[in-house]
Amino acid sequence: MDMKKMAGAAVLAAGLLLGGAGSVWAAHLEDIAARGTLRVGTTGDYRPMSYKDADGKYEGFDTELAVKLADSLHVKVEYVPTTWKTLSADTAAGKFDLALCGITRTFDRERTLAMSDGYLLFGKTILCRKGEEGKYKSLADLDRPEVKVMVNPGGTNEKFAKSRLPHATLLIHEKNAEIPSLIAEGKADIMITETMEARRYVRMNEKLAAPLVDKPFTRSRFGALMAKGDQDFLNYVNFFLAEMETDGTMDALEDTYIK
């Protein structure tokens, strides 16, 4: 085969591959409709975004947002449990259509997966025991060997603690929802968390305080997490989030779960 024919064959093959890939991904929304459910990955341990109530029912800002996303697709929600440690791998493996449970938008996640447009501005802060607020006025006050910092594994809290508090004593606890109570009981000194979670636990537990909640160490937004390659579905989720912002739904959810 001469060079011109080889080049032509290569172009044709590439076109067929691209066309095939496009048709596969274009069918993803159709698959959700045919299945009748939107599979939503959730850790179920992050107040006020996605958590379980006393009866084991999922609640929270992102939980309700997931229901509204499913409603827009005329299907029901099917929650699929995941953990912060396995979140990225489970997303890439296609165990659910998207994850929606208070997931911070990060460059690392965007490089390997797909993240939606951002919503809700927040930042990293701390929870400590009430009465000890005066001990923690800056990162320098936290970054000491005698300060026991507790975080859950695999998420941005652990990453923040390891990168910004290298001299503190780091304690890893598997269940994020248990950490605030452990702080209140004196099992650790501080919890690294986000501003909205800190505010929620301070309201729930009179033994806790969040002295730096109005001066967070970082500024971020949440996003829905999906596997790479499904541009049609990503476009739809981004359109949905924009509409929720425009029609006031985001403000209403914030009033209900965060303020």
PLM feature segments, named:
Residues A27-H28, T156-L170, L212, L241-K259:
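Ligand-binding clefts/hinges and TM-proximal coupling segments of bilobed small-molecule sensing domains
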Residues T63, E78-A89, L171-E185, S220:
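Short helix-initiation/N-cap motifs at beta->coil->alpha
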Residues L38-R39, H74-K76, T82, A92-C101, ...:
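Alpha-to-beta junction loops
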Residues A27-G102, R111:
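Extracytoplasmic small-molecule ligand-binding "clamshell" domains
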